[in-house]
Structures are given as structure tokens and as C-alpha cells.
């Protein structure tokens, strides 16, 4: 059961880091929203 918890924490941490980096850098593709 501990392995499942640690796996979930690892995936969520990597997801948050990727999310932050992706939205911190300017998008390469021009968007119509901004």
C-alpha cells in the first residue's frame, strides 16, 4: 500500500512541475485567447 502512495505522490509532483514550467514559458504556438 505504501508503494501506491509513493507512486501517486511522485506522479503528482512531476505533473505539478511540468504544469508550472509549461505555463511559465511563453507558448510557442500563437493562441487566440491572449
From Swiss-Prot:
UniProt keyword list: Chloroplast, Membrane, Photosynthesis, Photosystem II, Plastid, Thylakoid, Transmembrane, Transmembrane helix
Location(s), subcellular: Plastid, Chloroplast thylakoid membrane
Transmembrane region(s): 3-23
InterPro entries registered for this protein in UniProt: PSII_PsbT, PSII_PsbT_sf
Keyword Transport: no
Gene Ontology BP, a term: photosynthesis
Membrane topology: Single-pass membrane protein
Major localisation: plastid
The UniProt record lists the keyword rRNA processing: no
GO CC terms in record: chloroplast thylakoid membrane; photosystem II reaction center
Family matches, as Pfam families: PsbT (PF01405)
Domain of life the protein comes from: Eukaryota
PANTHER family from the UniProt entry: PHOTOSYSTEM II REACTION CENTER PROTEIN T (PTHR36411:SF2), PTHR36411
Subunit structure: PSII is composed of 1 copy each of membrane proteins PsbA, PsbB, PsbC, PsbD, PsbE, PsbF, PsbH, PsbI, PsbJ, PsbK, PsbL, PsbM, PsbT, PsbY, PsbZ, Psb30/Ycf12, at least 3 peripheral proteins of the oxygen-evolving complex and a large number of cofactors. It forms dimeric complexes.
Function of the protein: Found at the monomer-monomer interface of the photosystem II (PS II) dimer, plays a role in assembly and dimerization of PSII. PSII is a light-driven water plastoquinone oxidoreductase, using light energy to abstract electrons from H(2)O, generating a proton gradient subsequently used for ATP formation.
Family: Belongs to the PsbT family.
The protein, known as: Photosystem II reaction center protein T
Organism: Nicotiana tabacum (Common tobacco)
Gene of this entry: psbT
Amino acid at each position: 500500500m505504501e508503494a501506491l502512495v509513493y507512486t501517486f505522490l511522485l506522479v503528482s509532483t512531476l505533473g505539478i512541475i511540468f504544469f508550472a514550467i509549461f505555463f511559465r514559458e511563453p507558448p510557442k504556438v500563437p493562441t487566440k485567447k491572449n
